[in-house]
Curated annotation (Swiss-Prot):
Organism: Frankia casuarinae (strain DSM 45818 / CECT 9043 / HFP020203 / CcI3)
HAMAP family assigned to the protein according to its UniProt record, in alphabetical order: THF_DHG_CYH
Record-given protein name: Bifunctional protein FolD 2
Assembly and oligomerization: Homodimer.
Function: Catalyzes the oxidation of 5,10-methylenetetrahydrofolate to 5,10-methenyltetrahydrofolate and then the hydrolysis of 5,10-methenyltetrahydrofolate to 10-formyltetrahydrofolate.
Pfam families: THF_DHG_CYH, THF_DHG_CYH_C
Cellular component aspect of the GO annotation: cytosol
Domain of life: Bacteria
Length: 288
């Protein structure tokens, strides 16, 4: 048996096309163009590439690109003041502070200045609290992208034995909360889990966000299970994930590749969040 490969590029493309169509309809209906304010402090090359991709996607979706670039030596107070100005600006639907910020800045405190209604990354304490309580709000992009992939491939979650490997604030914990919200029967594993492979073998859905290359092999996968690989590691052979792809594809029923699986979903869900934020701000629709 060889797994069905989950095509994250195709799913992300469909999400982005739908968002672009809905943005056009929203502008026709309200006269308002959703706007995304990306904030980059400093000149870190990787961060600049990430922000550039988000800005291009924003424009392609018909949204306003409200990018702000500050020098690396900008003070905490000046970055905070900019975020406060963006929070008060009705032209700004969503705010994204690119992390990490330069040394000497408190990234968590800065992110905390973004109001929940404009927190398109879903990272503020308020947004995390809304997610934990199952209340409407903007959800973190990568975790919500994982759910979108599962839905797109008709993976049943309600009552399904599901394991999440990893408990990071960016992926592991929020995707666990989203899965619980979909009534999955959930187990969370981490670095102290005893006999990780045995626990994972009990899962019909396995989400791996451990941050360790090839931590999951064929021995950790139930035959026919759906496996979502969130990891991304640069190696001499190219990008690799937390899952041993070649071994696991012979056991799993469905499997995301790296690259081309979860990765493309992150920007797609960022665009969706920005549209949802704009809709909520006008009372026409919004996060649910």
């Amino acid at each position: 048996m060889s797994a069905v490969i989950i095509d994250g590029k195709a799913v992300a493309r469909r999400v982005r096309e739908n968002v672009a169509r809905e943005v056009a309809e929203f502008r026709d209906r309200t006269g308002i163009q959703p706007g995304l304010a990306t904030v980059l402090v400093g000149d870190d090359p990787a961060s600049a590439v990430y922000v550039g991709g988000k800005r291009r996607a924003c424009v392609e979706a018909g949204m306003a690109d409200l990018h702000q670039h500050l020098p690396a030596d900008t003070s905490q107070e000046k970055v905070a003041a900019l975020l406060d100005d963006l929070a008060a600006d009705p032209a700004v639907s969503g705010i994204l502070l690119q992390l990490p910020v330069p040394e000497g800045l408190d990234g968590a405190a800065l992110v905390g200045r973004i109001p929940p209604g404009k927190d398109v990354d879903g990272l503020t304490t308020a947004s995390v609290g809304l997610l934990a309580r199952g209340l409407p709000g903007l959800r973190p992009c990568t975790p919500s992208g994982i759910i979108e992939l599962l839905d797109s491939y008709d993976v049943e979650l309600s009552g399904t034995p599901t394991v999440v490997v990893g408990r990071s604030e960016l992926v592991g914990r929020p995707v666990a909360a989203l899965l619980v919200g979909r009534n999955a029967t959930l187990t969370i594993c981490h670095s102290r889990t005893r006999d990780l492979a045995a626990v994972c073998r009990g899962a019909d859905v396995l989400v791996v966000a451990a941050g360790k290359q090839a931590i999951i092999g064929a021995d950790a996968v139930k035959p026919g299970a759906t496996v979502i690989d969130v990891g991304m590691h640069r190696t001499p052979q190219g990008l690799r994930g937390d899952v041993d792809f070649e071994a696991v594809r012979e056991v799993a029923g469905k499997l995301t590749p790296v690259p081309g699986g979860v990765g493309p979903m992150t920007i797609a869900m960022l665009l969706r969040n920005t549209l949802l934020a704009a809709q909520a701000a006008t009372g026409t629709d919004g996060p649910g």
